[in-house]
Amino acid sequence: RRASIANTVDGNTAILASTAFADIFGAGSQSGDTIRINGTTHDGSTLSRVFTIEDAATTTVGDLLSEVRSMFGGNVSANIDSEGRVVITDNQVGSSNLTLTLIEENEGGGSLNFGSIEVETEGRLGLDITASNRDNRLAIEHNGFGDRNGFTIS
C-alpha cells in the first residue's frame, strides 16, 4: 500500500523518515497535533491508535512509522519511498486484509496530508505445490493433475 501524496522538505526534495514534522514543506505541523492511525490487520482485525507530535521540531516521520509498525505488532514494514510517500507492506504471506488510514487532525491549523493509502501491488495466489525430501534431494510437485496444473521454477 502506498500513499497518494508525496511530501517534500522544499517543494522538490522528498521527505525521509528522519524528517521532523516542522520541516515538511507547507504542512505547518504544530507541537501537540495528532494523527489518528486506523488499520486492519492481515487477518481482518481492526486497530486504532493516536500518534501525537510531541515537539514538531524533533518528532520525526520515522517516529510515526515506528508507531504504525508497533500497532501492527511488527507484522508490517512502514517506510517512506524515494518520492516522499508512506509505504506499508504486509510481511505475512497469503491473502491479506491489510489497510492503513492516517487521519491528520491538524489541531494547530496546519495542512499536513499523507493522502489515502491504496493498494499498489497485489500479491498473487499461491500455487498448490508440495516440497519434500526425496533421497536427500528437494522434490517439488504440483498437487493437481492434468496438463493445466503446472509451474515453472526459474
Where are these regions (language model features)?
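Short, contiguous acidic and Ser/Thr-rich linear segments
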Residues: 46-62
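Acidic, small/polar residue-enriched beta-strand/turn segments
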Residues: 1-21, 36-50, 77-154
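Amphipathic, non-transmembrane alpha-helical segments in extracytoplasmic/periplasmic proteins
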Residues: 1, 59-73, 121-122
